[in-house]
């Protein structure tokens, strides 16, 4: 008998992955956490039935949410990561010798526990001396911060359920206040393809654009995410994501990546016409 995991992208569309076995399942105080072993994508983490990562394509998301801002802000040393309990963002950040502090704020300790046990390739740098983990509500945490961080990475789940508060105008305003005078915030903005996701993306972008003087959207292609097409937000007090990219300095780090390159960095901000139109709709109102 075959066992398949299916995630509904809309009521009429679902994405299915054949499963060899279920490795972990637990209902935490916040969400259901499952980890599956699959023949095609390796181990797969889901939260409340939504794919958060697979071993096969996780590098795409983590490299794009980390290396894009790090290649622009060459002096980023103090970094706040919100969400990202799987450890992938931390793994990429610890590759930079200049980073002095990584504060990770994760709501659900069970996510960290599960990923340490079953996804060691993701959680392998969570014990780095520069990493400080705080299990608390990110909204409450960020309100206490003022001009403290060079970079904030918001690696939340989708803007529904437990993470809904991380897509509000209040939250983005708190992030602005928590950044130093040349700080950058990046966040995942979901897929623009299906109607519900597209509306959530537009709301998020409108709120960010009204908060930060520089606000852009960039893209990546992630096979196991909705429609295989994913967006990130880049918001900054000072730096432009393309004009202030120092490609030669980043290349000099000799950092091996599987997805990110400085050429791709530039190309990721060149968006298809339908998406440019969607963004203009909210920027002009």
Predicted regions mapped to residue ranges:
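Conserved beta-strand signature within the Rossmann-like core of class I S-adenosyl-L-methionine
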Residues: 182-189
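N-terminal accessory segments
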Residues: 1-52, 57-63, 67-70, 74
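Short proline/glycine-enriched turn/loop segments at secondary-structure junctions
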Residues: 220-224
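Conserved Class I S-adenosyl-L-methionine
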Residues: 172-173, 198-219, 233
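Alpha-helical structural signal in soluble globular domains
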Residues: 92, 96, 207-211, 237
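The AdoMet/dcAdoMet-binding core of the Class I SAM-like
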Residues: 2-4, 28, 53-182, 194-201, ...
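SAM/dcSAM-binding transferase cores
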Residues: 1-34, 227-285
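Glycine- and acidic
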Residues: 50, 189-190
């Amino acid at each position: 008998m075959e066992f398949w995991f299916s995630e509904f992208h809309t009521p009429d569309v679902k994405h299915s992955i054949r499963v060899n076995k279920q490795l972990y399942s637990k209902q935490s105080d916040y969400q259901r956490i499952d980890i599956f072993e699959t023949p095609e994508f390796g181990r797969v983490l889901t939260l409340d039935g939504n794919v958060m990562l697979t071993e096969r394509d996780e590098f795409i998301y983590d490299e794009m949410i980390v290396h894009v801002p790090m290649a622009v802000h060459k002096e980023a040393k103090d970094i706040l990561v919100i969400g990202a309990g799987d450890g992938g963002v931390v793994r990429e950040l610890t590759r930079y010798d200049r980073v002095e502090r990584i504060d990770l704020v994760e709501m659900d300790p069970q996510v960290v526990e599960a990923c340490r046990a079953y996804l060691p390739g993701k959680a392998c740098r969570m014990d780095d001396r520069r990493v400080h983990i705080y299990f608390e509500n990110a909204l409450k945490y960020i309100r206490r911060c003022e001009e403290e961080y060079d970079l904030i990475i918001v690696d939340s789940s989708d803007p529904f359920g437990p993470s809904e508060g991380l897509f509000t105008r209040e939250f983005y305003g708190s992030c602005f206040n928590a950044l130093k005078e040349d700080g950058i915030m990046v966040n995942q903005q979901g897929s623009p393809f299906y109607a519900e996701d597209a509306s959530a993306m537009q709301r998020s972008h409108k709120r960010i654009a009204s908060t930060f003087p520089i606000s852009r959207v960039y893209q990546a292609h992630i096979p196991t995410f909705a429609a295989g097409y994913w967006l990130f937000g880049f918001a900054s007090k000072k730096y432009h994501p393309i004009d202030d990219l120092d490609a030669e300095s980043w290349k000099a780090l000799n950092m091996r990546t599987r997805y990110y390159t400085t050429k791709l960095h530039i190309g990721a901000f060149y968006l298809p016409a339908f998406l440019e139109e969607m963004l203009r709709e909210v920027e002009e109102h």
